[in-house]
């Protein structure tokens, strides 16, 4: 990154001679290349600040799924800096070049040198490397192991237990290292002695952000999205609908399932994930407002952890009084990167000298969890309830990153079960292994789930294999878990809801439905305030690709060069490119039946 920036700046000083050329085309090409390379490097710097790992699956996922509910306050300053430096570079360059008088750059040797340095700055720009790795289909390099993806009929015993699953936001096991963070987590350190604690749980590719960690630990799969298709999942009605997750399995056993998280359910699609996988109650910031004492008492992300944990414990007590099994999954927030937040009940408690904000918040949450667990472990509820404390993922870039980066890092994973003997398990494992391992404590015969394995009875795939290569080998199968609605039965449109209904499935619109050679749904693309417009995506489709586009009529008319100013509503464009024909239909509460679609696309 720094080398690329240095080379860009050096090339900037050496380009004067070339830009004094009489060729306008040469000037535009050189300037465009320079600006684009600089801009993409600053994009990388911004995303690297957000993720701590450059442009990765987490960044791509949020670009595709949307950022509603995002804790934007934390990132205002980095975004302003990003915009500022790009404006400075753009506006100052003409002044700089106009006043640069070194005529030596006109020499051919210096021109060659300046172009060489510009090319090197492109080669060393980490933006391109990250994008290439994300776009490349690495599954072609591996022999697909059909036994990697574990699917089985799961049977529960008659003595099944309830389950409480508490994700501690970015509190990884590394923070228990007394050499690095002395007395940071005294309560968790004590609690570990009462648990089955797994000390070597890694985060594979596409699992190291919250919703990805949830999918990994509950479904045994990484959160891959079809990036190459420019697909956006924000308009989909289902979240990984074909994945078999803990919620689906427990629902089959008549568990009453609840999710409680302090943030907006729209952020990253968490609400959609839990609703898709059969949770009976799904509550985030807006749903919890009537349960908190002061609606103004909130962090940029949502409910503070002292209030959230009180709500969670109250819900456990209510559910335990019912004569049916339950599962409660919860997510804390205070320890969110980069700085964390402090609940009011911890205002006078700091860690060390108090200068490291994320460690202060972690120290606070440790105390809150200590009090929560003391109540739980001493209650009768514990007799028939297994409780899990775990990190949702490894910590992202925060105010303790300089210490963390030199550590042997692993996720927190502790199981509290009254009928199990406390122990440390040092076997190699990963996030996928958590779900099948936990369910075995509930009375299920889970040997595995997806790419995960039950660490009590089996070995993790990570033991003998590179788990990221296993992911790449199973990439196509994982992507198929998203599933698209089918158009073989036609569809109907609700203008009020901005939805297209395909039987019991739906998608939001505006939308572009791209069909494959069999005229089945291959991709669905949606419109965002920051996305490449659907009209551009239509124009970029291959000439033999059929599609259905539902959007504002004026956008479709402009695209098809139709002179019509009367219809201001929504329209449907059906285009059969193979036969060079199209049809525009007013979308007002319209229905398109299967016979019509078959006749149009298949000439039947």
PLM features: residue spans?
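Transmembrane and membrane-interface helices of multi-pass
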Residues: 1-136, 599-604
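Membrane-interface soluble catalytic domains
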Residues: 18, 265-268, 420-604
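Active-site-proximal alpha/beta segments of enzymes that process anionic O-linked groups
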Residues: 51-61, 86, 90-97, 118-151, ...
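Substrate-binding rim/cap in mid-to-C-terminal beta-strand-loop elements of soluble/periplasmic
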Residues: 212-223, 403-446
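Acidic helix/loop microenvironments that form the catalytic cleft of cell-wall polysaccharide enzymes
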Residues: 215-218, 275, 331-338, 388-398, ...
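Feature representing long, continuous alpha-helical segments
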Residues: 248, 310, 314, 363, ...
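Active-site neighborhood of glycoside hydrolase catalytic domains
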Residues: 340-347, 359-382, 410-413
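Metal-dependent active-site segment of extracytoplasmic phospho-/sulfohydrolases and closely related
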Residues: 364-405, 438-442
């Amino acid at each position: 990154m720094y080398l690329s920036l240095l080379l860009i700046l050096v090339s900037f000083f050496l380009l004067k001679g070339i830009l004094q050329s009489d060729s306008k085309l040469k000037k535009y090409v050189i300037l465009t290349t320079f600006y684009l390379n600089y801009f993409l490097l600053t994009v990388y710097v911004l995303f690297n600040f957000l993720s701590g790992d450059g442009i990765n699956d987490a960044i791509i996922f949020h670009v595709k799924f949307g950022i509603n509910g995002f804790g934007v306050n934390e990132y205002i300053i980095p975004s302003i800096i990003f915009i500022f430096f790009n404006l400075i570079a753009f506006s100052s360059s003409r002044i700089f070049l106009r006043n640069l008088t070194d005529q030596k750059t006109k020499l051919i040797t210096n021109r060659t040198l300046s172009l060489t340095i510009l090319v090197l700055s492109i080669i060393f720009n980490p933006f391109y490397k990250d994008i290439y790795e994300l776009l490349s289909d690495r599954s072609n390099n591996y022999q697909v192991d059909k036994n990697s993806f574990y699917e089985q009929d799961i049977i529960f015993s008659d003595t099944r237990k309830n389950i409480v699953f508490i994700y501690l936001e970015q509190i990884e096991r590394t923070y228990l290292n007394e050499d690095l963070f002395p007395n940071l987590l005294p309560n968790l350190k004590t609690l570990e002695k009462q648990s089955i604690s797994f000390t070597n749980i890694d985060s594979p590719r596409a699992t190291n952000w919250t919703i990805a960690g949830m999918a990994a630990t509950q479904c045994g799969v990484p959160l891959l999205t079809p990036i190459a298709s420019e697909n956006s999942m924000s308009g989909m009605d289902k979240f990984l609908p074909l994945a078999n997750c803990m919620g689906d399995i427990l629902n089959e056993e008549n568990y009453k399932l609840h999710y409680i998280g302090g943030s907006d359910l729209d952020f990253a699609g968490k609400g959609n994930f839990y609703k898709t996988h059969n949770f009976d109650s799904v509550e985030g910031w807006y749903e919890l407002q009537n349960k908190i004492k002061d609606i103004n008492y909130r962090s940029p992300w949502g409910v503070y952890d002292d209030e959230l944990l009180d709500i969670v414990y109250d819900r456990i007590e209510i559910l335990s009084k019912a004569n049916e099994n339950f599962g409660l999954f919860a997510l804390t927030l205070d320890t969110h990167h980069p700085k964390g937040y402090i609940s009011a009940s911890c205002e006078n408690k700091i860690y060390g000298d108090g200068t490291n904000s994320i460690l202060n918040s972690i120290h606070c949450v440790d105390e809150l969890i200590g009090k929560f667990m003391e109540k739980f472990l001493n209650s009768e509820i514990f007799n028939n309830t297994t409780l899990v404390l775990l990190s949702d993922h490894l910590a992202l870039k925060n105010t303790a990153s300089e210490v963390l980066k030199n550590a042997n890092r692993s996720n927190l994973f502790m199981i509290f079960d009254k009928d199990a003997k406390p122990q440390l398990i040092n076997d190699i494992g990963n996030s996928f292994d958590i779900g099948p391992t936990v369910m075995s404590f509930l009375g299920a015969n889970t040997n595995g789930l997806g790419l995960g394995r039950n660490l009590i009875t089996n070995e993790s795939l990570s033991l003998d294999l590179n788990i990221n290569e296993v992911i790449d080998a199973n990439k196509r199968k994982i992507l198929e878990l998203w599933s698209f609605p089918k158009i073989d039965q036609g569809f109907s449109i609700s203008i009020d809801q901005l939805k297209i209904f395909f039987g019991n499935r739906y998608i939001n619109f505006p939308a572009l439905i791209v069909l494959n050679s069999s005229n089945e749904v291959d991709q669905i693309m949606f419109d965002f305030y920051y996305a490449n417009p659907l009209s551009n995506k239509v124009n970029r489709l291959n000439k033999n690709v059929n599609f259905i586009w539902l959007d504002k009529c004026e956008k479709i008319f402009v695209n098809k060069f139709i002179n019509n100013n009367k219809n201001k509503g929504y329209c449907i464009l059906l285009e059969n490119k193979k036969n060079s024909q199209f049809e525009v239909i007013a979308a007002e509460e319209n229905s398109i039946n299967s016979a019509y679609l078959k006749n149009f696309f298949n000439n039947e």
